[in-house]
Every structure is written in structure tokens, then in C-alpha cells.
A protein has these predicted regions:
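Short acidic, glycine/serine/threonine-rich loops at helix termini
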Residues: 85, 103, 110-115, 146-147, ...
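Well-ordered secondary-structure scaffolds
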Residues: 10, 166-169, 173, 183, ...
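Glycine/serine-rich anion-binding loops at beta->alpha junctions
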Residues: 70-93, 97-109
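Acidic, glycine/proline-rich low-complexity segments that act as flexible tails and inter-domain linkers
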Residues: 1-81, 301-308, 312, 422, ...
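Short beta-strand segments
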Residues: 102, 136, 144-146, 177, ...
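Phosphate/diphosphate-binding glycine-rich loops and adjacent basic-rich segments that engage nucleotide
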Residues: 138-186
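A glycine-rich helix N-cap at a beta->alpha junction
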Residues: 116-142, 212-218, 222
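Alpha-helix C-terminal capping segments
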Residues: 40, 87-99, 180-185, 220-221, ...
């Protein structure tokens, strides 16, 4: 009742509620009332930090103290075609920054990094803790499933937020994301906050509020924290799928593929290097990161990482070894003009229906299917020119996807106003 009446909760009260709920001593109906009160009344920063720490202490934490060097972690608020980790992590790992990631699987319109990695023949995401820590120390990077039970409190709270309609609350989002990031043990945390159609925060103001809150909570908890706000009014890069996204990541690391994906990785990477004290400023950091592509060290690191997790490193040098879909079909543009908008969420759902994602937790994935976009926002297109290529398991699925994908594109006679991809950096 205290929060309902608009009062702040004490540290002890917050801890009592989170612990009690996690242990099953506080029933769902009481916790639902608390979530509704937080949703309507909000929380101040001290309460948000207390909530974050209480949720974090509800699970195990990852002890990286035995790992030498600077440890960094990146979190993305999600997005379609988001293969950032596959490019960014090898780049910074080749420069000596250690990155240990425990990832989730994809559900719905966003693909999980683990599913993308599992499209590489032999790749193993299930590592015992000992090997997880040994790999991050020796290779400099590890991306695996949840070895430790880092977030039992968050899982339980999230499920309840989902059914009570309290997902879009800043203190609840911040405590959910930051409890996991703090539990993951890194010194430097960089947050990739998406804003726009394909994301959770539809406006720049909302994204800025969320990013600022997360950065402040990270700093209060003693971590170097930065957030980058990026536009998500279209999928990131060109590929959406699993093996197709791995192919795009490889092409980017080979320097063959320039897109906003590379720009994002350079920006996030520069934040990590400057925060870690490995570069004097963003310009120096970007030069170091570009060098890892030019000299092949980032690609080599990706292959080393794949081999260290039982995957076939040859697939990194010869992407023809990755799974491929038997049917490819072009999506002709219905009109001439400029691409104004690509509905990211809908593109993700097209990929999911092709078999590239999960509608439910138990769905199986077809690693070869997906979509490769040829025309992105701002680009001119002629009627009949290919907007994208559908990669499908059979002709019928491909034809259905062609119609669905055509509907994802908005084409206008005039060029749209150019909007910057990177909206803001919050330090």
C-alpha cells in the first residue's frame, strides 16, 4: 500500500519483497499489486538501484576475478538482424579486452545470438563453468548458454510483468537488464539501446530516459557504463536469419561489407576501449578497431573462438560450409522511388515463419532460411528491381514470404529526410 500511495520504499522493504517472491513466500497476487504500483507511481533512482541489486542477489553472480585484463560486456535491447556480438566481440577480443557473454535463445521476431552460433557446424553453447572461465581467459571471448543461474528472480518477475501488463516501466526494465549485467561480472558495460519501430522504446525521449537511468545505475554500482542509442526503424544490416547473419558478420570482419552494422560496432567498440583506458579517445579507438579488420586479426579471433567451442573454424574462412536454404526467390519492388521505411518487427516475423525463429520455446530452427535485404531506407529503387532475396525451404514458403516481405516496405516518390543512425551516446 505504501508504494500505491506514492511513497518511496526502503532498501530493506525492496529486498524483502524480491527475496520473498523469489522464494515463493509472497504470492503472485501480492507481487502483481506491487508491480502495478511501481508501474503507476514509478521509482526514484535510489529505489531503482535497490531493486536492481535485490534482483541480482536473487541469483548467482559470475566471478571473473580469476580472468586477467579488462572485462567488458555489451547488452542490446534487442532488434531484428542484430548480429552485433558476432562482429564486435572478436574485434575487441583481438585487442585484449575479455568478453564473457551468457546469452539467451531467440523467441518471436528477434533472433538469439546462440541460434546464430549454432548454425556453425559443431558449435557448442553448453559449457561447464570451468571451461567457460578458461575460454574467456585464454581466447578472450566466450558466448554460451546460461551456465550459471544468474537471473531466477528476474525470470520470475518478467513472467509476472508479462501477464500483468507492466513490462513497459522504466524502473522494471532497468532492474531487469542491469541486474543481469552486474551479475555477469564485467568492469565495463556498454549498452546498445534501440529506438524506433523495431524496438521497445518507440521515441528518442523514451530511449534517452531508459539509457540514462541504466548508465546511472551502472555507475552507482561501481561499473564503467556507457549507452549508445541507435535507430531501429529497419533491420540492422542486410541479413535476417541464422547462417545468413553469420555470413554477413564474416563479410563485415573481412572488410567486404560496409553498413550501419559496422558503424555500430565501431561506436560500441570505441566506448569499450576508451572506458577500459586502452585508447585515449574515440578517434584512436576507432583506428585500432578498423585495424583489426584490415589485418585480419578480428576474423582470426572469430575462428579461434569457434574452434574453442567445438565448432568448425573452416566455416569462418569458407562460409559455403554453413547451412544454406535450397530455394532462393527475389522480391521485386512494386514501385519506383525511395525506400522510406522497412517494418523491422514484421521482417523478423517473416523470417520466423520461414523457419528461422521460434514461435514457441520448443520450435525447431531451420538454420539456412531467412532474408537478405538489398535495398535499405533512403536508397533509390526502380519498379521490378529486387528489394530482397528470400531463402526458403520450399517454393510455397518462398512465395508466401515474397508477398509478406513486399508489405514490409514503404516506397515513396521522394527521398526521405536523412536521419542519423546513431542518435546519442550517454556516458
Amino acid at each position: 500500500g505504501k508504494k500505491r500511495d506514492g511513497q518511496a520504499l526502503t532498501t530493506e522493504e525492496i529486498r524483502y519483497v524480491v527475496d520473498g517472491y523469489t522464494r515463493g513466500e509472497i504470492p503472485d497476487y501480492q507481487m502483481s499489486a506491487m508491480l502495478m504500483a511501481i508501474y503507476f507511481r514509478g521509482m526514484d533512482r535510489r529505489e531503482t538501484l535497490d531493486l536492481t541489486m535485490a534482483v541480482m542477489h536473487g541469483g548467482e553472480t559470475l566471478d571473473l576475478s580469476g580472468v586477467s585484463g579488462v572485462k567488458a560486456d555489451k547488452h542490446s535491447t534487442g532488434g531484428v538482424g542484430d548480429k552485433t556480438s558476432l562482429v564486435l566481440v572478436p574485434m575487441v577480443a583481438s585487442l585484449g579486452v575479455k568478453m564473457a557473454k551468457m546469452s539467451g535463445r531467440g523467441l518471436g521476431h528477434t533472433g538469439g545470438t546462440l541460434d546464430k552460433l549454432e548454425s556453425i557446424p559443431g558449435f557448442n553453447i553448453n559449457l561447464p563453468m570451468e571451461r567457460f572461465l578458461e575460454n574467456v581467459d585464454r581466447v578472450g571471448m566466450v558466448i554460451a548458454g546460461q551456465t550459471a543461474n544468474l537471473d531466477p528472480a528476474d525470470k520470475k518477475l518478467y513472467a509476472l510483468r508479462d501477464v500483468t501488463g507492466t513490462v513497459p516501466s522504466i524502473p522494471l526494465i532497468v532492474s531487469s537488464i542491469m541486474s543481469k549485467k552486474l551479475a555477469a561480472g564485467a568492469d565495463v558495460i556498454v549498452l546498445d539501446v534501440k529506438c524506433g519501430d523495431g524496438s521497445f522504446m518507440k521515441t528518442l525521449d523514451d530511449a534517452r530516459e531508459l539509457a540514462t537511468e541504466m548508465v546511472e545505475i551502472g555507475k552507482m554500482a561501481g561499473r564503467k557504463t556507457v549507452a549508445v542509442i541507435t535507430d531501429m526503424d529497419e533491420p540492422l544490416g542486410h541479413a535476417v536469419g541464422n547462417a545468413l547473419e553469420v555470413r554477413e558478420a564474416i563479410a563485415t570482419l573481412r572488410g567486404e561489407h560496409k553498413s550501419e552494422l559496422l558503424e555500430l560496432c565501431l561506436t560500441l567498440g570505441a566506448c569499450i576501449l576508451t572506458q577500459a583506458g586502452l585508447a585515449a579517445d574515440d578517434a584512436a579507438a576507432r583506428a585500432m578497431l578498423e585495424q583489426t579488420i584490415a589485418d585480419g586479426s578480428a576474423l582470426k579471433k572469430l575462428a579461434e573462438f569457434v574452434a574453442a567451442q567445438d565448432g568448425d573454424p573452416a566455416a569462418i574462412y569458407d562460409p559455403a560450409l554453413l547451412p544454406a536454404a535450397p530455394v532462393q526467390m527475389e522480391v521485386p519492388s512494386p514501385a519506383s522511388g525511395y525506400v522510406r521505411h522497412i517494418a523491422a518487427t514484421d521482417v523478423g516475423l517473416v523470417s520466423m515463419r520461414l523457419g528461422g525463429g521460434r514461435a514457441t520455446k520448443d520450435s525447431t530452427i531451420d538454420y539456412g532460411v531467412g532474408i537478405v535485404l538489398h535495398k535499405k531506407v533512403d536508397e533509390p529503387v526502380a519498379a521490378g528491381e529486387s528489394l530482397a532475396t528470400i531463402h526458403a525451404a520450399d517454393e510455397a514458403a518462398a512465395r508466401k514470404a515474397v508477398a509478406e516481405l513486399t508489405a514490409c516496405y514503404t516506397i515513396t516518390p521522394d527521398a526521405p529526410p536523412a536521419a542519423p543512425f546513431i542518435k546519442a551516446i550517454i556516458r
